[in-house]
Amino acid sequence: MELISIPALSDNYIWLLCDENRHVVIVDPAESQPVLDTLESRGWIPDAILLTHHHHDHVGGVPGIIDRFPELLVYGPAETQSKGATIIVCGGDSINFGHFSFQIIDVPGHTLGHIAFYQAPYLFCGDTLFSGGCGRLFEGTAEQMYTSIGKIAELPDDTLICCAHEYTISNMKFAHAVLPNQTISEYQQKVIRMRENNQPTIPTTLQTEKKINIFLKCDDIDLQRNIGITPNSQPLSAVFHQLRRQKDQF
């Protein structure tokens, strides 16, 4: 498999995944031209588009890509039907063609219908889990998002987290403010250097995220204390909610 990230808009990543038989999927195309240019440069013809949720910066490129490849299948949750999805999928479904076998995982929170696509080791999780952070709660509840992130945390440690935004520096700045330790500090400096060299910090691995992503550390006593919660006095979803609120105001 070959994985390509295409920078788009101000901080988006569009993903292309190509299997050994040159079957290609496009994930969350924010805009069309960068995708069309990349496909042309490699001589690839896409088979499908995968949409994680309905926000414009994840679906804006669908019409332009469909104009060029009108036979494309477009998979997405029900909330993306008006954005171009032709095959509606939800948690528990699977998508199989070529060497692809994607499992669909329901991950509501950022939006109510948000889904993720998983084919080991790749997880295309849209705006659910970022490196060092997680998505805002635009439609869902903190409890939903906490449960969704928990589903991701149960995947193998070598899972590649292919999220849709380059937010890592700002996420790590907040993480260091909340839970200043050597591991987080070192990773913060690492991603700063990467971005200074115009390198993407994505994909990351689930193993890395378990070490540096404070939204996966809601059971940490020091973290709870540092965000104003008496240790072990609240459900972990409430700790997550408080952490997300503080990130929104950071």
Swiss-Prot record:
One of its GO terms (biological process) is methylglyoxal catabolic process to D-lactate via S-lactoyl-glutathione. It catalyses: an S-(2-hydroxyacyl)glutathione + H2O = a 2-hydroxy carboxylate + glutathione + H(+). Pathway: Secondary metabolite metabolism; methylglyoxal degradation; (R)-lactate from methylglyoxal: step 2/2. SMART domains: Lactamase_B (SM00849). Keywords: Hydrolase, Metal-binding, Zinc. Belongs to the metallo-beta-lactamase superfamily. Glyoxalase II family. This is Hydroxyacylglutathione hydrolase. It comes from Photorhabdus laumondii subsp. laumondii (strain DSM 15139 / CIP 105565 / TT01). The gene is gloB.
